[in-house]
Amino acid sequence: MAAAFRKAVKSRQREYRERSQPGFRKHLGLLEKKKDYKLRADDYRKKQEYLKALRKKALEKNPDEFYYKMTRVKLQDGVHIIKETKEEVTPEQLKLMRTQDVKYIEMKRVAEAKKIERLKSELHLLDFQGKQQNRHVFFFDTKKEVEQFDVAAHLQTAPELVDRVFNRPRIETLQKEKVKGVTNQTGLKRIAKERQKQYNCLTQRIEREKKLFVIAQKIQTRKDLMDKTQKVKVKKETVNSPAIYKFQSRRKR
């Protein structure tokens, strides 16, 4: 009965309406309600309490107080930042680690050198840029013989094969024997492409072997610098070479 009565009373109540901002105050925005004021007041009170606590802490601070965390924290732009701690390594451990690095790099360099030698033997590399080119010298008695000299006729081979330093058959050999291997244009292009790919791989391996050699030298130089012997820098370090130092000579017992 009471519940039905409350419902009947509520149905006859006037609808609650919030007062809106008057027209002459429209430029000030929406009219602040009680809930908006409460949020603003709570935020203001919270900030004031925080400032009050900071003032109290500053008044009660002991100028001689010390915490061990102070040795690991620095103030940067008003913010406390923990300093990065470096790993402590003894000189003996560091020297051993660098020795291991040198051994590993030297092992990789030797492996690259073996692969280079294998590729060179497979490609019959006689005129590669990384190796000094061979020279064939002809001797003559007169200047007229030099002017009339024909390399293809002297070597008894075709003019197209003169620039070769390997696989250069004579004309009589070409006339007697049949051409062995692939003769169609497609097959020749495929073989030339594969050969060029192997040459590119060889070039990359030679460059990698050189870089590993330079890295090993630089690591060895840094390892030698850990010695306490007096030293003088003779040449600065570059991309392709390590720094050169002159060490004080010591008499060995």
Curated annotation (Swiss-Prot):
Localization: Nucleus, Nucleolus
Protein name stated in the entry: Probable U3 small nucleolar RNA-associated protein 11
GO biological processes: nervous system development; positive regulation of apoptotic process; ribosomal small subunit biogenesis; rRNA processing
Quaternary context: Part of the small subunit (SSU) processome, composed of more than 70 proteins and the RNA chaperone small nucleolar RNA (snoRNA) U3.
Species for this entry: Rattus norvegicus (Rat)
Known function: Part of the small subunit (SSU) processome, first precursor of the small eukaryotic ribosomal subunit. During the assembly of the SSU processome in the nucleolus, many ribosome biogenesis factors, an RNA chaperone and ribosomal proteins associate with the nascent pre-rRNA and work in concert to generate RNA folding, modifications, rearrangements and cleavage as well as targeted degradation of pre-ribosomal RNA by the RNA exosome. Involved in nucleolar processing of pre-18S ribosomal RNA.
Major site of localization recorded for this protein: nucleus
Chain positions with Phosphoserine modification: S241
